[in-house]
């Protein structure tokens, strides 16, 4: 027990005009038994507990006292917190007993561990490993770390991910919409052991939830990003663009980058891929492709595809490799939305311009 505790000296301090605190008088030499929903019975000797301060010398209550009073006032039925607060349970239990009040159900959840599985996840880990750990951004001095919101994570995705860190649905199901999660969740299925924070799995959940949200939400987001970046656009094309790229989004914050080639010509090109072609052959393929496009009806993409496939065959190039060249010319990279749907959205004139532009850049 804390030797600095001065029991029974309150009146002396008052008469002398000394500053004093009010402590909780822990019973001596007794066994304190508390109940935790996950841990079961927690038993400690009262001799290991200090007489904790309830009121500080300035008259303000401490956390422990205010916590219990607040929960009593609000008629809290369940206290759910991290297991690092388990050592406070005996004191809180004693305070409830002193008030002659029934304790709420205490549930001390296991910790969330670092990605490596060792040690509690901390806010610094986000900065260190490059992923968010807070709901929103936070500042500490000159340091600012982005939260899930700023990094483009949906609230329902983070909730889904976190729920499965500490709860087992009893089957292999992982993806839950909020209403389904509410129906399925049970305190009886909470995990007792700590879980590792997997940022890749968190990203996977976010991608799944982006696929499930209404397109209109992404349309609003994209329009906002286009306006913020002062990019001109045809509002009538936005729904079709969102439908094309929705399944490619892993975070909402990259929607502008993911759709940029629909609104402006690419400035960077995958020259590593282009090196698979002889320069003269690449220029010829691009030129002949432009001729096909110039004489095509853009409402008949199947015919365009057949004509381009025939061109590749005649030039002795696999159609897959040829389409890679075509795609790099249009969007600058190999990965992107459906090529022929993209062509229809950006229009014949833009397709021709981009084909000839890349041809001119090839040495």
Regions found by a protein language model. Give the residues of each.
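Single conserved hydrophobic/aromatic residue that forms the stacking wall/gate
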Residues: 1-13
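Histidine-centered active-site/metal-ligand motif
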Residues: 2, 64, 92, 108-109, ...
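Structured secondary-structure scaffolds
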Residues: 11-98, 284, 288, 330
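Conserved hydrophobic residues forming the short capping helix/wall of the S-adenosyl-L-methionine
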Residues: 96, 226, 312
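Catalytic adenosine-cofactor/nucleotide-binding cores of aminoacyl-tRNA synthetases and other
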Residues: 100-269, 275, 331-363
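C-terminal accessory/binding modules appended to enzymatic or scaffolding proteins
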Residues: 219, 277-330, 335
């Amino acid at each position: 027990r804390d030797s600095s505790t001065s029991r029974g000296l309150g009146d002396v301090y008052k008469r002398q005009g000394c500053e004093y605190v009010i402590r909780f008088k822990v019973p001596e030499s007794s066994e304190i038994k508390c109940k935790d929903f996950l841990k079961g019975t927690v038993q400690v000797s009262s001799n290991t507990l200090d007489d904790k301060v309830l009121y500080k010398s300035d008259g303000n209550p401490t956390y422990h006292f205010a916590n219990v009073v607040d929960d009593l006032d609000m008629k809290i039925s369940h206290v759910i917190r991290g297991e690092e607060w388990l050592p406070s349970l005996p004191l809180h239990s004693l305070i409830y007993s002193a008030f002659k009040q029934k304790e709420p159900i205490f549930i001390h959840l296991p910790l969330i561990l670092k990605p490596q599985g060792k040690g509690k996840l901390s806010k610094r880990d986000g900065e260190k490993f490059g992923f968010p750990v807070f709901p929103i951004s936070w500042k500490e001095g000159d340091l600012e770390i982005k939260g899930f919101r700023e990094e483009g994570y949906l609230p329902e995705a983070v909730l889904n991910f976190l729920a499965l860190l500490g709860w087992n649905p009893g089957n292999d199901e992982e993806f839950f919409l909020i209403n389904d999660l509410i129906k399925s969740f049970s305190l009886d299925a909470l995990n007792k052991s700590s879980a590792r924070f997997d940022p890749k799995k968190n990203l996977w959940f976010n991608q799944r939830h982006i696929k499930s949200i209404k397109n209109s939400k992404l349309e609003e987001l994209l329009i906002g990003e286009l306006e913020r970046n002062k990019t001109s656009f045809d509002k009538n094309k936005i729904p079709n663009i969102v439908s094309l790229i929705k399944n490619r989004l892993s975070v909402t914050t990259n929607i502008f980058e993911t759709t940029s080639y629909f609104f402006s010509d690419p400035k960077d090109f995958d020259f590593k891929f282009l090196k698979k072609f002889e320069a003269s052959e690449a220029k010829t393929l691009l030129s002949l492709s432009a001729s096909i496009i110039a004489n095509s009806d853009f409402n008949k993409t199947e015919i365009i595809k057949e004509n381009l496939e025939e061109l590749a065959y005649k030039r002795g190039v696999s159609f897959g490799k040829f389409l890679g060249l075509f795609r790099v010319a249009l969007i600058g990279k190999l990965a992107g939305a459906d090529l022929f749907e993209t062509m229809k959205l950006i229009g014949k004139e833009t397709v021709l311009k981009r084909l000839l532009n890349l041809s001119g850049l090839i040495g």
